[in-house]
């Protein structure tokens, strides 16, 4: 669980066969009882904050929520006569609508052109791959020597191909004991293409508390939580594999990893001037024309990435680091203990380099022997 700025505040371990939505109740109790929060807004993805969880857990608890609709629900909104029509995006990429299916709630519909292009490209790639595989099956059915025969055998081969890329909805299939034919379904493809790049953010918060832009920004801030989860599991802390076999030890292991990430999160913010990390999130957000648009690095971050140097500090600019390379640099600092005579010990610290001195300064640390 993370705060709005991405700072981790709590972690809990569940049995491996527990579905994500079923973990919600305990987290609400934690927020209210342990943290004594009176007003809580839960921001979660469409897999966690499902309609069932909203109706059974969040609404009775009087909580606010921000989540997104699944593809079938978006398709219903876009049906003939529905509130979600292409004309909404003639001169904007975000609009607010309502629907009787979501009483007392606000729906913010967004269209991201870059996401639309990517989905169209991926669909074309999947269609082409599926068509090639189906053509090979058709050739097996039509060949003179040892042809593929039997509706069941042909259907099994076709099902494997369609299931691999999940493209069954976009093909019309005809199978008999000794024939097989297929064709793309243009109506299905066109209907899906019409919704490319469109997503719908759902909330019960009043406009005075969170307008459309703030609601979209809050939902997109989930990327920070996802980054924290990835950092714990893989690239940074490598939580797995877990070499523990009892529940208390597994929980202790996960808690220590979360505390390590908490420390890393604060260190990265303090060391941002020396890292490739974004130093000025407010400037990055201010240059966006819309919260739907892709976030670009701030001018300061772009200069830092281009020059591979920090802003001038005490003379020449310093090299820009990743978090890991900077830690590696700091790890070269040594503390040497010298024995003088039999009983006298003297500790001597290595003299920090300019890079190390600046890092320690940003962290508010003063090395002592």
Predicted feature descriptions by range:
Residues 1-369:
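Anion-binding and metal-coordination hotspots
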């Amino acid at each position: 669980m993370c705060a709005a700025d991405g700072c981790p505040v709590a972690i809990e371990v569940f049995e491996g066969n527990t579905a994500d939505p079923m973990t919600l109740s305990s987290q609400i109790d934690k927020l209210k009882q342990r943290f004594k929060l009176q007003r809580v807004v839960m921001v979660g993805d469409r897999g966690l904050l499902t309609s069932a969880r909203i109706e059974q857990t969040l609404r009775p608890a009087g909580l606010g929520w921000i989540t997104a609709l699944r593809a079938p629900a978006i398709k219903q909104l876009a049906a003939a006569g529905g509130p979600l029509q292409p004309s909404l995006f003639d001169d904007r990429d975000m609009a607010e609508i309502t629907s009787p299916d979501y009483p007392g709630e606000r729906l913010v519909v967004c269209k991201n052109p870059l996401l639309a292009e990517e989905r169209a490209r991926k669909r074309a790639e999947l269609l082409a791959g599926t068509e090639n595989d189906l053509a090979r099956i058709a050739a097996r059915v039509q060949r003179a020597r040892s042809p593929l025969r039997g509706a069941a055998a042909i259907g099994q081969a076709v099902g494997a191909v369609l299931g691999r890329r999940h493209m069954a909805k976009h093909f019309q299939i005809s199978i008999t004991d000794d024939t097989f034919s297929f064709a793309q379904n243009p109506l299905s493809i066109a209907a899906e293409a019409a919704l490319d790049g469109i997503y719908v953010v759902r909330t019960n918060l009043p406009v005075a508390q969170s307008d459309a832009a703030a609601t979209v920004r809050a939902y997109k801030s989930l990327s920070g939580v996802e980054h924290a989860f990835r950092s714990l599991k893989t690239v940074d802390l490598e939580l797995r594999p877990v070499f523990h076999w009892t529940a208390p030890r597994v929980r202790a292991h996960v808690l220590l990893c979360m505390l390590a990430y908490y420390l890393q999160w604060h260190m990265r913010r303090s060391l941002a001037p020396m890292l490739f990390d974004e130093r000025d999130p407010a400037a990055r957000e201010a240059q966006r024309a819309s919260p739907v648009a892709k976030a670009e690095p701030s001018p300061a971050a772009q200069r830092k990435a281009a020059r591979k140097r920090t802003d001038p500090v005490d003379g020449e600019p310093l090299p820009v680091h990743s978090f890991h390379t900077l830690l590696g640099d700091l790890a070269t600092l040594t503390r040497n203990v010298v024995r003088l005579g039999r009983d006298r010990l003297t500790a001597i610290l290595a003299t920090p380099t300019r890079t190390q001195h600046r890092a320690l300064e940003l962290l508010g640390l003063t090395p002592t022997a």
